[in-house]
Amino acid sequence: MRNKIALIFGVSGQDGAYLADFLLKKKYKIIGITRNNSKSNLFRLKKLKIEKKIKIYQNKSLNSDFLKKIFNKNKIINEIYYLSGETSPLRSIKEPIQTFESNVISLIKILEFIKL
């Protein structure tokens, strides 16, 4: 039986990192999406010692070209987790439109893409 493949949007955040660790222990292959793949942003994955076990893609503005690239490179994706979005309450108040785009519009784009 083949290992299941999970795509995690927001893999470098707290919940994404813990989910990736959990799924790796269940023998999943993980594809992770993060807005920022700098070393300082991937510290949770590094602390869990799973950074090298995840195929990580960086993308700041989710669009159909990026989604096509991910799904073309990874023909079979069994599960998709959307844990991405603005996590700073102060920033969400200061930048409500950007927060809405990050938290809602990006998810809608993913759902529209996978329904095709």
Predicted features, each with a name:
Residues 1-116:
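N-terminal Rossmann-like NAD(P)+-binding domain of SDR-like oxidoreductases, especially those catalyzing
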